């Protein structure tokens, strides 16, 4: 196959090229397990092959340099000093104090992994058109739409770390934008140009998905909710679906100061997924509290998440009460309490259900973060078993962020407080005092 030959000739020399461009940790194409591999020369000769390639990208998002660590609970939370890493012998002490060597070692992995993965993403995008005859219309629009969204998302994560403070200096040259699978060294672009290209990718993805993504008419499609649909088109929360793409447009617009666009898209996502339909409802009190050992990640609210079969390892290797002080990541009890309002924390489901007082190896009782603790699939009502995915989900984008964007961007104070209080109610927290809005407006 001419296309496959061209693809793997490119990848043959990937290690040499990325070393020149500082991308130093090249993996083989998608690095899939044997059960998900197909022969190289048939990769894009079938719809199944396209899905294998795309699934491989989603799998790689769980790499420790991406959402399997750095971007979810580790590197930047350590740098933000959320955790108690003060002791010299603590594994993360140097990183928490901005030691340059430690910081470079952690952050460079993000840059390397993203630009390596972008070669794969761009290859899929190109294949969608070069091998278009292989795909029916639905698969073409969904696969290319998701791949373009992935390209925007991967660049956005690098942009947030390596880009300037956008409101201060949007013309600073900060990073290249990878739009091709060729391995040419690309120049650093101005932040404003990177932002434009990311938005172009997200908007193109939105356009491709809007008439073809099953999420629009049928919702997230967990489990048996998608009869008649191929497996590739269900579990839409585990893909960059249409509503997740719109949410990223809102996030990027807010990041770059375009509050009007951010507000428009956040409103649309809320209206289309919670008001007109019930596709991504807030977690119920029963699921969050009565069945507290089940849904600690608020599955129904996740617009985009990743399925991590080893998620319990996150807890066991990072947050478990069985770990010693040298390796555990744990805030002080005082810092934990400071994250939640004093008057309402006793009712806040995030505080009462995601933190648990447990004995450490020395027998001292301390609060531990149990959001990612393993879920036992041998107990509980059938409709709350692990088959629903609670124990494997790593959240990436939630519907709740859209409420916060509306609250921040709306010039209508009543609308802003309504959205803020709807979100607070969905966490068991009392309404905010609208009188505070006077100071809110004064700061604008």
Locate predicted features.
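Bacterial Sec-dependent N-terminal signal peptides
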Residues: 1-35
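Membrane-proximal, proline-rich intrinsically disordered regions
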Residues: 26-75, 99, 308, 431-432
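Conserved, well-structured interaction surfaces
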Residues: 51, 90-162, 184-193, 202, ...
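Short, surface-exposed recognition loops and adjoining beta-strand edges that mediate ligand/DNA contacts
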Residues: 70-83, 164-171, 215-317
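Elongated scaffold/linker segments in the mid-to-C-terminal portions of large proteins
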Residues: 268-419, 425-426
